[in-house]
Amino acid sequence: MLGIGKKFPNYSLTGVVSNDQAKAFQNFDANTHKGKWRVVFFWPKDFTFVCPTEIAAFGKLEKEFKARDAQLLGVSSDSEYVHLAWRSTKDELKNLPFPMLSDIKRELSSALGVLDAEAGVAQRATYIVDPQGVIRFAYVTDLSVGRNPQEVLRGLDALQTDELCPCNWKKGEDTLKAA
């Protein structure tokens, strides 16, 4: 798995940004959000059980991420057409405020080292990428375990302080001073 301090790989992926088929698809690459923080999270498959709970939870926090100049990008190995069908039929995904990217060739998940070879899908990986394109946070759970988007937001807050942040630190609390 590509880790902290490494450059996030280049990518060129098609994403679903709307339920209106005429405006549904948009291309995204590593330069699309250049100069911004990115939160890139992977889920294994569309039309499953744990995945929509995570995606919807990230969607509910999108304004919080945006307020921190961070772009959410959700990714799976399903095609953009499968993403559109799922998004159009699953109530909690219908109005997602961030793109659902298709890594159908599994190039990005492979480059990051988060492709589960046995299952043929991406692991539940989350990356926070700084404005220079460097990985600053990496978090992976088992395929059966959903992650906590609130913790990802806390991690972003901590990274953006550029200070020492203790366990369970929250935005607005004191950071540590090295003595």
Language-model features, listed with the residues they occupy:
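Chalcogenol-based redox active-site neighborhoods
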Residues: 1-179
